[in-house]
């Protein structure tokens, strides 16, 4: 039986093309049943205050960096979205006097315009946000060397190689409306993928690359980062891929309700917990990663029901 067309963008794959039973099962999850989805390799965490939520995310950076030594460089591959943890990271590093001399950081992604990654003068630049919200706030004597900061904005093969040369302790991130991590979006519904999206095995072969963004992602970034100004959001981005993700010891997804909604926060967890990987829901591919953690701000879980505004 052929899969339905997307309700949002018929020329693309996305979660609206799933078996309706999967969607219905996810929508039924209560706060209690969502928490019980934890299984070996997949752990659900709840936080009752937003302060604790972002402090816990910030501590992941610090805990990873404290493992780094001259003989064993260690890093973290971090997102822009969420960003609220970044100033807290800098404050903890400064307060505890933690030297980042041997620590590393990978930026997950960066916008691309006309085939070229945007510079830090672009208002939506992710590198710009990382430096303004975190790195420039760290005491100069504690900062990591610039060569230890890696963005997917140059030689992407070299960027990928660093994940083999350096231990990526943790890859934290958020979840987008397309159920992506980084910019691992669903693909267009054309060519060999006209009738079915890439298999999980095919999608997992993707490494860092420049990719076309799903219309949902463009709209979301205009809403969350650009005041709704869609014209200012690039249509392509360079992104970390599944290859680098599977070289990371832990994947840690933080959901405060700012980016995805109550249904989306349930759907990806359901598919990971029940091991239903489908590249129309890229986050579901993490069902096959050995160490995934989902962190929720409890008040954002809400319910999947009618709430008129």
Where do the PLM segments sit?
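ATP/nucleoside-binding phosphotransfer catalytic cores, i.e., glycine-rich phosphate-binding loops
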Residues: 2-17, 36, 41, 47-49, ...
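ATP/pyrophosphate-binding catalytic subdomain of soluble kinases
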Residues: 59, 152-197
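Glycine-rich N-terminal segment of FAD-binding domains in flavoprotein oxidoreductases
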Residues: 67-97
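A glycine- and small-aliphatic-rich helix-loop capping segment at beta-alpha/alpha-beta transitions
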Residues: 89-100, 122, 186-195
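Class I SAM-dependent methyltransferase SAM-binding "motif I" and its flanking Rossmann-like core
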Residues: 182-234
């Amino acid at each position: 039986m052929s899969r339905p067309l997307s309700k949002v963008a018929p020329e693309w794959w996305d979660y609206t093309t799933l078996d309706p039973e999967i969607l219905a099962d996810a929508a039924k999850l209560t706060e209690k049943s969502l928490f019980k989805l934890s299984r070996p390799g997949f752990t659900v965490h709840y936080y009752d205050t937003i302060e604790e939520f972002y402090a816990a995310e910030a501590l992941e950076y610090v805990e990873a960096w404290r493992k780094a030594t001259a003989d064993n460089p260690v890093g973290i591959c971090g997102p822009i979205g969420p960003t609220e943890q970044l100033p807290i990271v800098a404050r903890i590093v400064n307060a505890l006097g933690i030297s980042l001399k041997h620590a590393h950081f990978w930026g997950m992604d960066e916008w691309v315009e006309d085939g070229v990654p945007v510079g830090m003068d672009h208002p939506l630049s992710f590198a710009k946000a990382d430096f303004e919200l975190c790195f420039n706030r760290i005491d100069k004597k504690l900062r990591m060397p610039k060569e230890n900061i890696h963005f997917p904005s140059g030689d992407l093969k070299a960027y990928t190689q660093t994940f083999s040369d350096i231990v990526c302790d943790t890859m934290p991130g958020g979840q987008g409306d397309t159920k992506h991590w980084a910019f691992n979006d669903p693909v267009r519904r054309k060519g060999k993928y006209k009738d079915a999206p890439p298999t999980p095995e095919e999608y997992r072969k993707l490494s860092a690359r420049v990719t076309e963004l799903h219309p949902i992602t463009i709209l979301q970034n205009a809403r969350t980062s650009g005041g709704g100004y869609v014209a200012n959001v690039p249509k392509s981005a360079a992104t970390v891929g599944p290859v680098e993700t599977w070289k990371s010891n832990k994947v840690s997804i933080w959901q405060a309700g700012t980016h995805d909604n109550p249904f989306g926060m349930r759907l990806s967890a359901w598919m990971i917990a029940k091991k239903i990987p489908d590249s129309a829901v890229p986050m579901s591919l993490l069902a096959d990663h050995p160490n995934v953690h989902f962190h929720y701000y409890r008040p954002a879980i809400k319910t999947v029901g009618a709430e008129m505004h």
